[in-house]
Amino acid sequence: MKPGIHPDYHPVVFQDANTGKQFLTRSTLTSARTVEWETSEGVREYPLVVVEVTSDSHPFWTGSRRIVDAAGQVEKFRRRYGSRKSGASSD
């Protein structure tokens, strides 16, 4: 590997925005927010990255369904593209 071309890979705490559960792992992501985490070497401070979905809240892993705002997505599509009719003109 060439030195100096790879991003810094360091410990980071990810927090699920829905459940509040936190996971300590390694990542290239960083954040200005920090959190204290108890380790075998004492309490350490790590960057905190808040994410929308983790395995703690994803329906595939929890076995529960989550209501998705499909109606809002449909309205956004209709506003953007309107109700376009077939392109054939009757001349």
UniProtKB/Swiss-Prot annotation:
SUPFAM superfamilies per UniProt: L28p-like
One Pfam family this sequence matches: Ribosomal_L31
Keyword Ribonucleoprotein found: yes
Any single biological process term in GO: translation
Keywords: Ribonucleoprotein, Ribosomal protein
Gene Ontology cellular component list: ribonucleoprotein complex; ribosome
Molecular functions (GO terms): structural constituent of ribosome
Stored Gene3D superfamilies: Ribosomal protein L31
Family per record: Belongs to the bacterial ribosomal protein bL31 family. Type B subfamily.
The name this protein goes by in its record: Large ribosomal subunit protein bL31B
Recorded superkingdom: Bacteria
Subunit structure: Part of the 50S ribosomal subunit.
InterPro entries: Ribosomal_bL28/bL31-like_sf, Ribosomal_bL31, Ribosomal_bL31_B, Ribosomal_bL31_sf
